[in-house]
Every structure is written in C-alpha cells, then in structure tokens.
UniProtKB/Swiss-Prot annotation:
Record flagged with keyword Protein transport: no
Catalysed conversion reaction: RNA(n) + a ribonucleoside 5'-triphosphate = RNA(n+1) + diphosphate
Major enzyme class: transferase
InterPro entries in the record: DNA-dir_RNA_pol_bsu_ext_1_sf, DNA-dir_RNA_pol_bsu_external_1, DNA-dir_RNA_pol_su2, DNA-dir_RNAP_su2_dom, DNA-dir_RNAP_su2_hyb_sf, RNA_pol_bsu_bac, RNA_pol_bsu_CS, RNA_pol_bsu_protrusion
Subunit note: The RNAP catalytic core consists of 2 alpha, 1 beta, 1 beta' and 1 omega subunit. When a sigma factor is associated with the core the holoenzyme is formed, which can initiate transcription.
UniProt-listed NCBIfam families: PRK00405.1
Gene3D superfamilies attached to this UniProt entry: 2.40.50.100, 3.90.1100.10, DNA-directed RNA polymerase, beta subunit, external 1 domain, DNA-directed RNA polymerase, subunit 2, domain 6, RNA polymerase alpha subunit dimerisation domain, RNA polymerase Rpb2, domain 2
Descriptive protein name: DNA-directed RNA polymerase subunit beta
Keywords annotated in UniProt: DNA-directed RNA polymerase, Nucleotidyltransferase, Transcription, Transferase
CDD domains referenced in this protein's UniProt entry, alphabetically: RNA_pol_B_RPB2 (cd00653)
Keyword Transferase: yes
Any one of the GO CC terms: DNA-directed RNA polymerase complex
Length: 1273
C-alpha cells in the first residue's frame, strides 16, 4: 500500500501518520512517578528516620523512665477511596508504633506495646490525597539547597569585587562570611555582630597566630593582599582560645556572665553537635562537593567540623584572588526539590517534637508502678500537625481536575513559594527568569501569567528527582575511546591503527572484528580511539554535573550505527553554545521534547510559535472542558497517548484475553490462564471543577484483547489519546466585523450537532439536625408551598432521579421548628386536641440556586437510623447531584493550542456561513489580523496540514522540534489537490469524515503523464508539489512543462496574483458568501484547526438581580454573583451620569435602587400597585457617614429626621439672599443638615455656617454666605 494512507494502529483503530525524523531512544517515563515514589519513601524511610530521631524519650533528669520506639506498621484503611469521596471522609491508614517502656529505678522492661499514632492520609494510586471527600495534590517545593554559597558583590566605596559567603544548614545557625575592602574576612554567627574570622578560628582550637597562618600559607599568597594577617591585626586584644571564646559568648548571650567552659559548650552545641546543627544529607553532599573535601560517606557526619570552616575560609580567599569562580544561586545545582514525602515528614517532625515534650513532662510526675506507654504519649499534636498540613498548607492544593491534562500538570508542578520559600513580593526578576540549567529539567514555557510568573513551574517531560532532591535529565553517552578489553569494541570503526611491535593488528578506519578484538584485548591495558559514536546507554545527570560536559542536541545527524555524519557539531557547554568536532562531544540529548513539559509538548509546531503565546497555549489546554463527543486532534504531537495513559482516566488491559462481558458499568476479561479481570467504569462522576468524568467501553463482547490495549475511554480521551477539543473547518477572514478584537464566528451546525456541548455537574447537600428548639425534619409537608412545587418530590420530600429542575425548585423539603413564645389558652387547647401539627415551623428546604438548572442524576441519603456514621447532632444527610448539558453559546471562550483565544460573538446560521467551491460551509471564522502581531504561526501550519489530513482521511503526529517542515506540508496539500482533481475523495454526507482512494488518484496521475506511486511516496519530497503546480498551470492555460523549482513557483505565484485564484500548495480557497452567493475578493486560508472550549463559560458569569440581600451596615445590595448581589455603580459610573446630565436616573441609582430603606420599600409597593414611584429619601450611607464623623469625636447629628425637599420658589428666594428663621432652615434644606461643635471655620468657606460656640452648624446648598452676626441664629 502506498504511504499516502498509513496503517491503522491495531490497538486503537486510529490512523495516525508520524512526521518524526528522530527515533524514540527513551520512552516517556511514568509522569506521576515523582509523587508516588516520594510517598513510598516517606512510609518506608522517612517515618523510620523520625522515630529514630526522637527515640528513646527520657525524663528531664534521665533516671526515672525511658520510652523506646522499636518499629511501626500501617494497618488496613478503614474506608475505600470510593467510600471516602461519597461520605466526605479522609482516605487514611491507622499508624501503630511499637513502644517499649523501661523503668530506670527498678530496671524493669515492660512488654512492647502497640501505640496508635493517628490516621495518616494515604496517597491514592494516582498520586492524590482524599481529604474530607475532595481530591487534593501536594505540590513539590523548589528552594535553595542547604550548603555553602560563594557570591561576589562590588564594594560601594572602591568598586572592587569582594566575596560574600553563606553556610546554610538544614537545621541550625547560619554562618555568614564577608570580606571588607581592607582585606579583613569577618563572620556573623546567626545574624549577630561581625567578628574577625581569626577569632572564630581561635575559638575552635587554632589558638596561635602561627597555627592560623600555617593553615592558609599556600592559598593566601597574593603579594598585595594578606587576608588572614589583616584579620588577625583587626582584633589585637584577642590572642588565645579563651579570650576568643569569651568574646563570641558575650556577643551571642549579651546578658549572661561570660565563662570559658560555658562558651566552649555553646559553640560545640551550636555547630558540632548533630542534635542542634544538621547540614542534612543534601547539605553535607553539597559542602563536600563545593569544598572538594575528601569524599566520605555522606550520612557519616552531618554536623560541621573544624576542617569544614578552614576549607570555607580558604575558598573565600581563592574567590577574592580570582582563583575560584563564585556560585550562581539561581543554578538548579543550588536549588533542590522538596517532594510530598519530605514535606509530610517535616510536618510530622513538628508533631513528634511536641509529643516528645509532653511525654517528658508526664514522665516526671507519673506513678512508676501504674505507668504505661499510652499514659505518657499524647498523639493529638501529631494528628493536628498532619491535618493542618493537608488542610491548610500553601502546598496542599485543591486538585485541578478540569481535564486529564490539568491533573497531570498539577501533580508535576514546582512552586518556589510556601513555607521556607519565597513570597511574591520579595521575589526579584532573577529568580523568576529562565536559567540555562533548566534545560531538560524545568519547562521554559509553562508558568502562570500573573504575579506568580516564574515562581511556579512544571517539570520537563523526561526529568526525574534524585535522592538528594536535585532534578536530573537523561543523556545518551558518546564514546570516542574504550578500554582495549571492552566488548563494545566489536563492530566499531577504529580512528587510528593499532600495532604491536611493528605488526598492524587493525588499520585506521577498519571495523573491529571478533578476531581482531581477541588480539587487541591481549595487549597491556590501554585506551583505544574509535570513531565517535552515540551509544544506547542513557545517563541521568543533575545540573551541576552536566556543566562539566559538552552535550550535542537531539537532532544531530547520525547514521544508523550512531556515528556522527557532520565534522562540526552544534553543542552546549554550561551556558555557552559551541561548535565542536565529534571527538570532543561527551553526551547527546535523548529527545527534542525533553526541554518541555507535558502541556507544552502537546502543542504542534511549537517551534513556530512565539514563547509568550506558547505559554498561553500550554495554560489554556489545562482549562479545556471535556466535551460530549470527544475528538482527538487531527494534527497531534504524539504526546496525547502518554498524557492520557498517566492521567489514570483511561483503562488498559492488564493481561491478554477475551472480553466475556461488556456493559456500561463494567468490563470483564477472561484471561488465557482462565482467570477473570474485572474493570469498573466511572459513570458521570463530578470533578472538583464541576466537569464530568464518564468512562465508556470501546471494545465489544467476544473481542480478543491484547495486554496493554485500551478498554475504555474517558470523557476527554478518544481511543486512548487525549481529546480536549474538536477539529473544525476554519477560515481566516473578516466577516461583517463580527470577529473584531479576536471575537469568533461559529456555525450553527456545531451547536446542532453538539460539537461543543459539555456536561457540568453540581452537588447540593442538606443536613437535618437536632436544634435547641427541636428536631429538623425532611418531609414533603412544607407550609405555604403549592402542589406544583412538590410534584417531583417523593413521599419523603426528596427529589426523584431524572427530574428536570430550575432556579428555586425544591430538591429536598425540610422544616425547622421556630422559636416559640408563651402559648395562649386557646393555642394550648388546639395543641392538646391536634397534637404537634399546630406548631410553628419554617421552610428551610434545599432549593436550586438562582440561575441554575439541570437534571437530577443521583441522590444519596445517609441516616443515623440506617447506621451511617454522621457528625454529632446530624440525623439525616442528603446529597443531590444535578447535571447540565450546556451547548456552546455567544460569550463562551474558545481557544486553539497556540495561545489564540477569543470569545464567540455570533452563532450564524449554516446557510449564511462562507462556503467552499464544493458547497461545504466553514465551521469557524477567525480574524487574520490576530496572527502576524502575535507571531504564533503554528496555527497556520496546523490549519494547512490539518486540511490535507482531513481530505485524505488520516491524522497526523508532528512532535515538537521534530515534525513536518514546509516541504512536507506543501506536498501534503498538493496530494490532497491531486486526489480531489482525480475525484478520489469521497465527501458523501453519510461518512463522518472524507476518505481518499489512493489507487484512483494514482491511476488519474498516470493518465496525466506522471508517476503516481512516486508522488504518493514520502521518499521523493517536493515531487507532489511540482506535479500539482504543473497541472494547475495547465488548467489555467499556461504551459509549464519545461519549468521546475523556483521558476515554477514564481510562475504559479504570478498567475495566482493575476487571476486571484489560489495555487494548490498555498492552502487557500475561493469562498462564497452564504448570504449573497458572491465570491469574496481574495482567496482565503481554509483548513482544519483543533479548537477547545474553555471553562470560562458565559453561563457561569452572566448574572442579574431584582430584589435580593442587602449588607447590614451600609444597607446597599451585596456584591458578586455568589451572594446574588447587585451591580456596583461606582465613582466612575457616577461621572458618566454627570456627563449626560441624567439627574433623575442618578438620583434613583444612589437612593431607591440602593440604600434608601424607606424609599425602596415604597418604590416596590408603587411598582406592584402600578402607581408612580414617589420621591426618594435619605440614603443609609448618609447615616453611616454621620456615625463615622461621630466616631472621630465630632458631635455631628441630624437636626430633623423628617427630611423634606424645599419647594422650588423657596429655593429661588434663598438664592436671592432671603434667609428664613433657623428652625425653617433646618427643616427645609435637608439632605445635608449637620450639627457640630466648631471653633474656627474660614469666612470664605463654600458652605455657609453660623459661627458661635455650641451653636447649630447649618450647611446650606446655596452659594450665599450667612451673615455672621445674624441675631436670629
């Protein structure tokens, strides 16, 4: 079969043609391995380390009791994952620690006892935690590693670069070394005052000047600068160990009387005692590497040693003298990752330390004869520390479950924030920026756009985390020399000839055979130079180790045996890009996508997109809503299958066999061994974001199943590939101005065929409790509710499954007893006759929120009577799930994968949409102006290649930086044109997609005088393009048989420009307007693009209110959709009303529509009665203003509560200066009438006042001034 139609993948049935040039050397690793491995480490090692740290616990004196912990075990979880999500419980396991108690006074060893240490949240198989019924993810933290760091900063006075050093432990006091411009090296201990470094050296045992100078004589040898001598001379009074100890002690403990023994003890505790000072495994490893100390076992001594301090000072001198380079603190060799296991361990440690303190206190007071381990240990601090971490830590996040990609990304996220990390405010530009050491470790594309940019990142596809917490990435080893006894030599080419005593054993350039290897291996041990080749051996390296090597790119040209084809190779060496001969290359990248995260490597033609837009594309894919009819992309990258596999939403067969039962609920496979594998399917499960997970089988009963085959798809996968959007026919053109500013025009066909329809599920809950006034009751018998409202409720007052519900519909009927007053004699009589029925109850039913609707898909009832475990005072608990089927609508946000996003502005009838020459209307019209300035040309290439794939009936995989190039796309378009010309494309409506008959196309091409088989063969790039252009020019009446290459393209371009008809390779079509039938002026780019519907749906955002809740203080409507609030009419909106002079509108906005309490009640009444709305009164905010002024100590009060507006003739007489009596003033000019105690108000004040002690202050609205000595006031 010709390669035009690639073979369908047997396991999935999807035809996907890959344009990858490079082989997959390393498979994509398990994408959630980091989470799983880390938690397993915590369970097996992390917890053991903690228990060893605190064991044994002794009393304060150390001679009464000793409590030893000798082991621990996790028991079985009490509830399954499913039960926990249903009942809002935490998925956890009980931890039991084996404790042994020793009574020191009698020597009695009590029997080991299993102590319950609380329930520890357990990680699910998908790397998440279920706490209180919701799935959460613990994000890994990226922070500065413990170790020693040498940095250089310029001295402000002299401009000379000076070394500054920090020694950061995992736990303990920091040491900071500084160099002054007078060559004195000083040290700060734990941030206290500086002391010369010579004082610290004397205090740790180098007491004599000569001893100190001898330590540094080899290094401190600059004739101009003598750092150690300058430091000694800086403090001439301190000449021995005791004076140095006392000096340091007096700085660290300023109030205590200094004493040499106490000082020695303090310094030993502070730096050399593992209980108080711990570099940690990582810190010790980093210190040893940086100071090039003799490599001893890392776990051996995690406290400081004298030698460490000396080595640090030696390095400071070397950095100052330019003999050593300073460190880059943003380098990934100096930043490590705290994964889940370590974060939980740190939190657990806090709880254990509190537990230890309580146990020691109890040991001192407990009765020795009656004592048991459980009497000493209080587990509450441990339980609360762990609970606090999972519930409230910045790093424990509500899992983003919008779609499968969002889940994976959330689990692979790295945050530089959180406890012990950076804050948004303090983080500068350098920390946020992309660093060369991120290559292959942290994605340079995927990061948020807001204030967290650069502080939150994502692990690259192939990266992993080593045991010290550093990110590693894989490289292929390049060999140019091998030992003469290495069996790898067989089959390799020699670079130089090998001879022994003048006899040539193997000539240069020859291939080493088995025989020649035997001769070479008998030579004395030596290195054999071979032609440099890339082996299959893969090595994972952290960033600091990688800096030592020269590394070639993944797309370096190799032959089939791994030899380099070029004489000069482009490569990286630390931050430099170099071109080197092959024998200098040490390693080579494993894949072009190793640089990027999962989300970024899902963007086809990423190499043609601007980084800013690629960032948006990567982030928006995570916001795509799973659609009702999931469709994998026409143009993919090949990562879709990996993302779907590790999301946990696709079900794969564990073993080969035959499908014995396939239903919507479960699949049963009968294996070859005769056993049965059962797979349960998730049906309409609500995610954290309200989207829907619904698995459905894609196999049939009786079908043979291979191991690893896809059995069931989820709501966002198709045939085991991620399917977040829809393939649409798009045209880039403007249409009636409806796609102005990135707006999108959609065809009604997409709405009708449910292309962008999605399911959203909401969960509603109600509890019936015991209250002080009586028991709440779930019932159908609700006061003042008509039968119409109860028609969908069952006899218990709970809605039936399948009911269609709308805003304010009752889901669960509930009545609550009202507070009862003293009953009258008549009421007591009624109560005695009719029993409880007559009592006062209020309706507290669960209703659908405003603006929501849907269909009830599930109801769960938990009752104390049925033995369910419910919280205190709760008798019954009902949960109702409501699903909405939302069609796409105007205002919804759509996006491509290249950062091209927009809002739907119109859904046009199919008959009005622009249509192709064959009558096919386009689905989406996008604005062409949105492309050039955004520089995301990937969308255009995707459109072209997608169109060719659409017409020829196959899908495409074009991996990032290793995909289809221009020639390939032009050839694909040319083949689709030739097939259409030959009538080989079946566009019949009963087919879901077009399909092409390759043989028919080849026959037709043969009739035109060309070799059809060659044209449809990928091995002849450019041939299809050339043939299609010649045939097109022939159709246009131009003879181009003698033309080829650039001349042919130039001719086709000229003819196309003159005729305004597109050539076959430009991916354009002549479109007609669906309303008029006339052709558009220019040919339009038409193709197939993958479009996503994002979770920013207009239905969740649109909101309107009539009457509703008000704020208690301001009496203004609440704000926001969640509170059913009003629209804020702010300062700027008021200015707009001023500008239009709409005084009445403005008045009612600020009064009866807002916080004029009496006015709004009257207005409502008037509207109901159909009368004119009365005049507004004083807004409540005026009273708030008065109260605020009073709170400042001003005696402000409203003189007359009865606010009246002055008649117009009164106002005009006031304006002419005719002042009324003061009691008239206070009654008439009212909205701003105030009373105050005032001393000094300027005469030319705009407001007129009466100035006298303790007199009324009247503010009038006219501009005339009130006479100061007017007697009437």
């Amino acid at each position: 079969m010709v390669s035009m139609l690639p073979k369908a993948d047997a396991a999935t049935g999807v035809i996907r043609k890959s344009y990858a040039q490079l082989p997959e050397v390393v498979n994509v690793p398990n994408l959630i391995e980091m989470q799983l491995q880390s938690f397993v480490w915590f369970q097996e090692e992390g917890l053991r380390e903690l228990i060893e740290e605190i064991s044994p616990i002794k009393d304060f004196v150390g001679n009464r009791l000793e409590l030893e912990f000798i082991g621990y075990e996790f028991r079985e979880p009490r509830l399954s994952e499913y039960e926990c999500t249903q009942r809002d419980q935490t998925y956890s396991v009980p931890l039991y620690v084996k404790a042994r108690l020793i009574v020191k006074t009698t020597g009695e060893i009590k029997e080991p006892f299993d102590l319950f240490f609380g329930d520890i949240p357990l990680m699910t198989a998908l790397g998440t935690f279920i706490t209180s019924g919701t799935e959460r993810v613990v994000v890994s933290q990226l922070l500065r590693s413990p170790g020693v760091y040498f940095t250089i900063s310029d001295d402000p006075a002299t401009g000379r670069p000076l070394c500054h050093t920090n020694l950061i432990p995992s736990r303990g006091a920091w040491l900071e070394f500084e160099t002054s411009n007078r060559d004195v090296i000083s040290v700060k201990i734990d941030g206290r005052r500086k002391i010369p470094v010579s004082t610290l050296l004397r205090a740790i045992g180098y007491s004599d000047d000569l001893d100190i100078l001898n330590l540094f004589e080899v290094i401190d040898n600059d004739p101009e600068r003598h750092y150690i001598q300058s430091s000694i001379d800086r403090d001439p009074l301190i000449k021995d160990e005791i004076s140095a100890l006392i000096d340091i002690y007096s700085r660290l403990r300023p109030g205590d009387p200094p004493n040499a023994d106490n000082a020695r003890k303090l310094i030993n505790e502070m730096f050399f005692d593992p209980q108080h000072y711990d570099l940690g495994k990582v810190g010790r490893y980093k210190v040893n590497r940086r100071l090039e100390l003799p490599s001893r076992e890392v776990g051996e001594n995690r406290a400081l040693t004298r030698e460490d301090i000396v080595a640090i000072i030696q390095r400071i001198i070397m950095v100052n003298n330019g003999q050593d380079t300073p460190d880059d603190i943003d380098h990934l060799g100096n930043r490590r990752i705290r994964t889940v296991g370590e974060l939980v361990q740190n939190q657990f440690r806090i709880g254990l330390v509190r537990l230890e303190r309580v146990a020691r206190e109890r040991m001192s007071i407990v009765n020795l004869e009656m004592v048991t381990p459980s009497a000493l240990v209080n587990i509450r601090p441990v339980v609360s520390a762990v609970k606090e971490f999972f519930g409230g830590s910045q790093l424990s996040q509500f899992m983003d479950q919008t779609n499968p990609l969002a889940e994976i990304t959330n689990k692979r996220r790295l945050s530089a924030m959180g406890p012990g990390g950076l804050s948004r405010e303090r983080a500068g530009f350098d920390v946020r920026d992309v660093h060369y050491s991120h290559y292959g470790r942290i994605c340079p594309i995927e990061t948020p756009e807001g204030p967290n940019i650069g502080l939150i990142g994502s692990l690259a596809t192939y990266s992993r985390i080593n045991r010290y917490g550093f990110v590693e990435t894989p490289y292929r080893k390049v060999y140019s020399k091998l030992k003469n006894n290495d069996k790898k030599l067989v089959g390799l080419k020699l670079k130089i000839e090998i001879s022994e005593k003048g006899k040539v054993l193997a000539a240069a350039g020859s291939t080493i055979s088995e025989d020649s290897f035997k001769l070479i291996s008998k030579l004395p041990e030596c290195d054999i130079s071979v032609m440099p080749f890339v082996s299959a051996e893969v090595k994972y390296m952290p960033a600091d180790e990688e800096d030592r090597y020269i590394i070639a790119q993944a797309n370096t040209r190799l032959d089939e045996k791994g030899y380099f084809l070029d004489d000069r190779i482009e490569a990286r060496s630390a931050e430099r890009y170099v071109v080197e001969p092959p024998d200098k290359i040490d390693y080579m990248d494993v894949s072009p996508k190793q640089i990027f995260s999962v989300a970024a490597s899902l963007i086809p033609f990423l190499e043609h997109d601007d980084a800013n837009r690629a960032l948006m594309g990567a982030n928006m894919q995570r916001q795509a809503v799973p659609l009702l009819r999931a469709e994998a992309p026409m143009v993919a990258t090949g990562m879709e299958r990996e993302a779907a596999r590790y999301s946990g939403q696709v079900i794969f067969a564990k073993h080969a066999g035959v499908a014995s039962s396939v239903t919507s609920e479960k699949i049963i496979i009968r294996t070859a061994e005769g056993g049965h594998d059962e797979y349960l399917l998730k049906k309409f499960v609500r995610t954290n974001q309200g989207t829907c997970i619904n698995q459905h089988a894609i196999i049939n009963k009786g079908q043979k199943i291979a191991a690893g085959q896809v059995l069931a798809d989820s709501s966002a996968t198709e045939n085991g590939e991620l399917a977040l959007g829809q393939n649409c026919v798009v045209a880039f053109m403007s249409w009636q101005g409806f796609n102005y500013e990135d707006a999108i025009i959609l065809s009604e066909r997409l709405v009708r065929e449910d292309a962008f329809t999605s399911i959203h599920i909401t969960k509603h809950e109600l509890e019936a409790r015991d209250t002080k006034l009586g028991v709440e009751e779930i019932t159908r018998d609700i006061p003042n509710v008509g039968e119409e409202s109860l028609r969908e409720l069952d006899e218990d007052g709970i809605i039936r499954i399948g009911a269609e519900v709308g805003p304010d519909d009752i889901l669960v009927g509930k009545i609550t007893p009202k507070g009862e007053t003293e009953l009258s004699a008549e009421e007591k009589l009624l109560r005695a006759i009719f029993g409880e029925k007559a009592r006062e109850v209020k309706d507290t039913s669960l209703r659908m929120p405003h603006g929501e609707w849907g269909k009830v898909i599930n109801v769960r009832i938990f009752s104390r009577d049925s033995g369910d475990d419910l919280p205190a005072r709760v008798n019954k608990w009902v949960q109702v799930w409501v699903a909405q089927k939302r069609k796409v609508s105007v205002g919804d946000k759509l996006a491509g994968r290249h950062g091209n996003k927009g809002v739907i502005s119109i859904i046009a009838p199919v008959e009005d949409m622009p249509y192709l020459p064959d009558g096919t209307p386009v689905d989406v019209v996008l604005n062409p102006i949105g492309v050039p300035s955004r520089m995301n040309l990937g969308q255009i290439l995707e459109t072209h290649l997608g169109w060719a794939g659409h017409l020829l009936g196959f899908r495409v995989a074009t991996p990032v930086f290793d995909g289809a190039d221009d020639t390939v796309i032009e050839d694909a378009l040319a083949r689709s044109w030739l097939s259409a010309k030959a009538g080989a494309i079946d566009m019949s409506p009963e087919n879901k997609r077009p399909s092409a008959d390759a043989h028919k196309a080849i026959e037709w091409i043969k009739q035109q005088g060309f070799d059809g088989k060659k044209i449809f063969d990928e091995k002849h790039p450019g041939l299809a393009k050339e043939v299609s252009l010649k045939l097109w020019l022939k159709d246009m009446g131009v003879d181009a048989s003698a033309l080829s290459g650039a001349e042919l393209e130039k001719k086709a371009y000229d003819v196309s420009s003159q005729s305004r008809l597109p050539s076959p390779i430009v991916g354009k079509s002549v479109l007609r307007d669906g309303r008029t039938g006339e052709t558009f002026d220019q040919p339009v780019t038409v193709g197939n693009m993958y479009i996503l519907k994002l979770i920013h749906l207009v239905e969740d955002k649109v909101h309107a209110r009539a009457t509703g809740p008000y704020s208690l203080i301001s009496q203004q409507p609440l704000g926001g959709k969640a509170q059913f609030g009003g629209q804020r009419f702010g300062e700027m909106e008021v200015w707009a009303m001023y500008a239009y002079g709409t005084a009445h509108n403005l008045q009612e906005m600020l009064t009866i529509k807002s916080d004029d309490i009496a006015g709004r009640a009257k207005a409502y009444e008037s509207i109901v009665k159909g009368e004119d709305v009365l005049q507004p009164g004083v807004p409540e905010s005026f009273k708030v203003l008065v109260k605020e002024l009073q709170s400042l100590g001003l005696a402000v009060e409203v003189i007359n509560e009865e606010v009246k507006i002055a008649p117009s003739e009164k106002v005009s007489s006031l304006n002419e200066g005719n002042l009324p009596a003061s009691d008239e003033i206070s009654a008439e000019i009212l909205p701003e009438t105030l009373y105050a105690n005032t001393e000094d108000i300027s005469e030319d004040s705009m407001m007129s006042v009466i100035d006298a002690d303790d007199q009324d202050l009247v503010v009038s609205s006219n501009d005339e001034e009130v006479s100061e000595n007017d007697e009437r006031s």
